[in-house]
Amino acid sequence: MDRGLSTGAHQGDDGLRERTVASQSSSAPGLEALTATGEGEVKDKAGKGKKTYGRTPGGKVFTVPQTHDMVSQLLSPSEPKNLSDIIVLVILAAHILLLWRLPAGAKVPVFAFIYLFWRGAYNAGIGWLLHNQSNHRTLVRWAEKTKIFVNPATGQNSHANLYKLIKRELKTKIPADYSFEDAPIEYNTWLVFRRLVDLILMCDFTSYCLFAIACSQRPLDEGTLMTALRWSAGIILVLFNLWVKLDAHRVVKDYAWYWGDFFFLIDQELTFDGVFEMAPHPMYSVGYAGYYGISLMAASYKVLFISILAHAAQFAFLVFVENPHIEKTYNPPPPRKRTIDQENVSITPQRSDSPSAPAPLDEQVPHAPSYSSGPPPSVHNLLGFRNLDLYRTIDTSSILIQFLVFALTVLTPSTPWFQFLFVANAAVWRIWYSVGIGLVLDRQSNCKAWTRHFVKYGESPQEAWNQWKGTYHISMVMCYASFIAAVWKMYSFPADWGYGLVLLRHVLGAGLIALQIWTSVSIYESLGEFGWFYGDFFFDESPKLTYDGIYRFLNNPERVLGLAGVWGAVLITSSGAVTFLALMSHILSLGFIQFVERPHMQKLYGRSLRRDAGLTKSLKRSLPPSLQQLHGSVDKIFDESFEFIEELIDTARPKLAAGVNTFVKDTSALFQKYPARVTISRIDEDLAGYDSRDYSLEVEGTDSLSPNDNDQSGREGANARMPLDRRGDLKNLVFEYGSPIKVKWTAPLNHSKKDWIGLYRVTDNTSREVTRVSSQGRWIAVNEGSYDNLTCEKGIVSSDILIPASQRKDNENRDLASGEVIFSGDKLFWTQGVFEFRYHHNGKHNVMAISRPFEIRISRFDEDEIPLMDPTSVELSLFPVVRNCFDRDPQIAPETVDEPFGSLVERDGRYAKRIVFAVHQMFGIEFAPEVVKADGNVHNLARRICNAKRVLAPYSLTKNGATTPTEGKE
């Protein structure tokens, strides 16, 4: 419902800390710009309303009639009512009646269960339906299979009464511009889906309110003033929630409210205003403020906790259902660049700042280095658990330092002396993190002091950048580790959780901590590694501001939200010392923004900075003119005050800079399978009449270049060294890694339309009659339209082609049906091994035929023939493997060794992982997937392989020293 979709792009003109995002395409605004799929009318030049047009996935264009929201349809007397409305109203009335009739002791548990049921139906039920509709068009396929929208007069629909009921229900709700018979099946399916959504959403909200009523109470020791304040705050939150819902519906209309883009798209101009300028995904974030308002009015922790649970479930719905669909629908990867700028290639065939493999060692000659002004490619990121690398000094140092800090925290007593030490330590680190780092960045902004220091000793700007990232990372880790340690020392476990506001303080504190974590993650997602570490202080090439993610709504999210967690710690501890640390942290953070970030951003971006973010604009528009003028006067006072402080600091800056410079010179820096699934084998008892001799599977694929590698290594006995004696002309099937595999099948003419073919390892199944291992998505149906998803039909080439009995090789006199399917991409095993295909009966796991076993093998590069690792030879060997790893998709697979990879490689890590596995098997070199993304084409990757082989040659265990320490040929 929320969709979070009307967060579209708007042209900004100011903002801080929204830095240049290196190595990111400008496609990000495309996601935001196209995700507000409101159903407002497209208007002509005269301003007259025009019709809205929709487009189905098949390309059919139709008129989208005007519809109304569910509350108006159900409760407004002016709206026509039908059977489904009456059913919903009766169910709602039953909920209210149940609350009235239940005994007092049963109301709370019963309505807690009822609400959790409807909340599960919303987030899990509707989420499952939408997920399958997005990926497999499941709801539309159900409608196609049951033919419920087909006129029974045609003889194709046997449910005449159901057809009449649905037709009457839909036409009653949409009297104009709607024809049930002519509307696309996608639109009719969406209308039926809406009725289910109406039922679930109305019951969800009603049961929540009834649960709150059942839990409502007034604390015994609460005064009249506190009661009035509690109810006033609750009512304000509920009214704010109501405004958010109404304004969001005004913008997105019913189309996005009911997830219409899961079924079809509409052609119209997009509008971005109101609540969608205030917060990301407002219906799922600030749109749940009313839940906490109701919790306040009910004065019940039960209502508060169930509200938090519901809010968390709604965010899970957003993350796992809506966001993947939005990304797929509105932000597809840009097409791959098929041509290369020949002029640039001829002049500078290998730019120094391009993400390419390093030059061979023997080609390097002493000369003055030329430094690139552009940022280095981001290959090995620093932040995040997935980027943790214990071989990297900064990561190991961070872990060791944190371990020592927390060990000291736990092992030392919480006496006043130790509490003072830990608070002082946290204060020192906060001062360094804000003031010390701020001075370093200020000197870097004005005179490139940090970079000059490393260039002075012959290092590159990239090395200065890497060292800076380590320094900043350690400082940030120690700042927060020391703060957490101080909080731990000042915290005392409550003796009575029910006393006063103890429990509420802990809940609010945990919420603020979660808010800071979410803010930090959002900032990192928007800025990337480059912006997080203030990359535009170090590299000035082509500065460009981007306002997306959290920066669409706030210029400086770290100004308030970025420090919410420290105030959460204040609430939890109720300690004066922690309050002092939080206040100091906030003041220093504001000073850092004002005196370090703002001057640099103004110098670098000038007038391209916007003055007001989306939230600020919305709040200003809501103020009366007199208050807007007052706001401007206050801003002027603050600006003048900050200018005075800046002048004061400028006067004292030389002395401070000299001290910091001495300190820097005299100090040296220190320091993911799918969960196992229980698979129940489904055995069909109705196998009578099917002859297994009528079923067969024949496999065809691209033969491996060296299918006989290592067949005879000299380790065998005398008899085993003799040439292989084959009885027949069948040879071993050995296919290339990742190449598509064609499977030809035969079956009786009366075979089940739900038959399917699966791919398995030969060792996975001990039974030849029943498959007891999950295919994990590696299966294809033999007929189209038999299953409720489209994925299983990808790969079908032909079905039910008649083979006369005269053409059978086994001399049987029965005709057969035949077909072809092609397994490719995700339907293959991306590893080496021996595999087989199995033909299964009627959607179950009964095996009717098994193919010949075949091997998937990656041919090892023959270094004896080319001992010098010629890059051209490596390119020729690597190129077909890379194309296979990219599923031979023209959008991402290159046509030549110099063509760049498609942009999807940057988003989906599986492609790069396939390549690094193949490289490891072919050349004995292990790369990280990020290397493939950074190199960008086969040519650069081949050069990197050659260089790596040369570098590691001295450590080789083979005779000629041409390979790395791996299992070599003997």
Swiss-Prot record:
Residues on the Lumenal side?
1-85, 131-195, 245-277, 322-389, 442-473, 518-562
Q: What is its EC number?
A: 2.1.1.17
Ranges per topology, Cytoplasmic: 107-109, 217-223, 299-300, 412-416, 495-496, 584-970
- Which pathway does it take part in? Phospholipid metabolism; phosphatidylcholine biosynthesis
Catalyzed chemical reaction(s)? a 1,2-diacyl-sn-glycero-3-phosphoethanolamine + S-adenosyl-L-methionine = a 1,2-diacyl-sn-glycero-3-phospho-N-methylethanolamine + S-adenosyl-L-homocysteine + H(+)
* Compositionally biased region (Polar residues): 342-355
Query: Which Pfam families has this protein been placed in?
Result: PEMT (PF04191)
What are the subcellular locations of this protein? Endoplasmic reticulum membrane
Q: What's an example GO BP annotation here?
A: phosphatidylcholine biosynthetic process
Q: Which residues cross the membrane?
A: 86-106, 110-130, 196-216, 224-244, 278-298, 301-321, 390-411, 417-441, 474-494, 497-517, 563-583
Recorded superkingdom: Eukaryota
| GO molecular function term, any single one | phosphatidylethanolamine N-methyltransferase activity
- The question of whether Lipid biosynthesis is a record keyword is answered with yes
Q: Which GO terms describe its cellular component?
A: cortical endoplasmic reticulum; endoplasmic reticulum membrane; perinuclear endoplasmic reticulum
**Stretches the record annotates as Disordered:** 1-59, 330-375, 698-722
Q: Where does this chain mainly localize?
A: endoplasmic reticulum
Alphabetized, the UniProt keywords read: Endoplasmic reticulum, Lipid biosynthesis, Lipid metabolism, Membrane, Methyltransferase, Phospholipid biosynthesis, Phospholipid metabolism, S-adenosyl-L-methionine, Transferase, Transmembrane, Transmembrane helix
Residue ranges annotated as compositionally biased, kind Basic and acidic residues, are 11-20
Task: Report membrane topology.
Answer: Multi-pass membrane protein
Q: Which family does it belong to?
A: Belongs to the class VI-like SAM-binding methyltransferase superfamily. CHO2 family.
So what does this one do? Catalyzes the first step of the methylation pathway of phosphatidylcholine biosynthesis, the SAM-dependent methylation of phosphatidylethanolamine (PE) to phosphatidylmonomethylethanolamine (PMME).
Q: What is this protein called?
A: Phosphatidylethanolamine N-methyltransferase
Gene that this sequence comes from: CHO2
